[in-house]
Design a protein with these regions (language model features):
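Sec-dependent signal peptide recognition
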Residues: 2-9
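Short glycine-aromatic motifs
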Residues: 21-24, 32, 40-43, 88-91, ...
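Conserved polar/disulfide-associated segments of primarily extracytoplasmic proteins
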Residues: 43-135, 140-142
Length: 164
C-alpha cells in the first residue's frame, strides 16, 4: 500500500499507546470503541493514529483517531475535515454532507486526488461533541475504492463513544 500510506500519515493527529483490541473491538483510552472490519483488513501497529488498518487486495487503508481538547472541538467541521486531508494533491471534493449523529455534529466528505502521483479516492468522516473530535478516513486507489467503502461505512457506524 505504498501510495496510500503517505496520506494516512499526513492526516493523523495524535498517537496513543494504551488502546486495546478484544474480540474484534477496538477500545480507545479516549472513551470510544469500534468494531474492526472483516476479512482482509490488518491492524498496522505503531502508527500515528490510534487505529490504522490496511488491506492489500484490493488495496486500501483506513484509520480512526480522536483529539480531546477544547481548542480542536471549537473548530468548524469543514476546517477539521480539511486538516484530515492535507496530504492529498489535486483535490476535488465530490460530496460533502453535514448532519447530526447520536447527538454529535457530523460531516462526511468524499474526495478525489493524488498521492505520490497515484489517483485515489478518500472518504473522511468527522464527528464532534463537546469533549472530542473523532476522525475516520478511508483511502484507496480510485479503481479499488468501492470494494472497501462498505467496510468503512460499517466501521464508522460501529462507533460507540463516551457520554457527551
Amino acid at each position: 500500500m505504498k501510495a496510500t500510506g503517505p496520506l494516512l500519515v499526513a492526516v493523523l493527529l495524535t498517537c496513543c499507546s494504551s488502546s486495546r483490541i478484544e474480540n474484534g473491538i477496538f477500545y480507545s483510552p479516549k472513551g470510544y470503541q469500534l468494531r474492526l472490519p472483516g476479512d482482509g483488513w490488518a491492524v498496522l501497529p505503531g502508527g500515528a493514529a490510534e487505529l490504522e488498518l490496511q488491506r492489500k487486495n484490493p488495496d486500501g487503508g483506513m484509520l480512526a483517531d480522536a483529539t480531546c481538547d477544547g481548542k480542536t472541538t471549537s473548530r468548524p467541521l469543514a476546517v477539521l475535515t480539511r486538516h484530515l486531508t492535507f496530504g492529498l494533491g489535486h483535490r476535488e471534493t465530490v460530496e460533502t454532507v453535514q448532519n447530526e449523529a447520536g447527538g454529535r455534529q457530523a460531516e462526511r466528505t468524499l474526495l478525489r486526488g493524488t498521492v505520490d502521483g497515484r489517483e485515489v479516492a478518500v472518504e473522511a468522516v468527522v464527528l464532534k461533541d463537546k469533549r472530542c473530535v473523532y476522525d475516520f478516513v478511508y483511502v484507496a486507489p480510485v479503481d479499488a475504492f468501492e470494494a472497501g467503502r462498505g467496510d468503512f461505512q460499517t466501521f464508522v457506524e460501529s462507533f460507540a463513544g463516551a457520554t457527551r
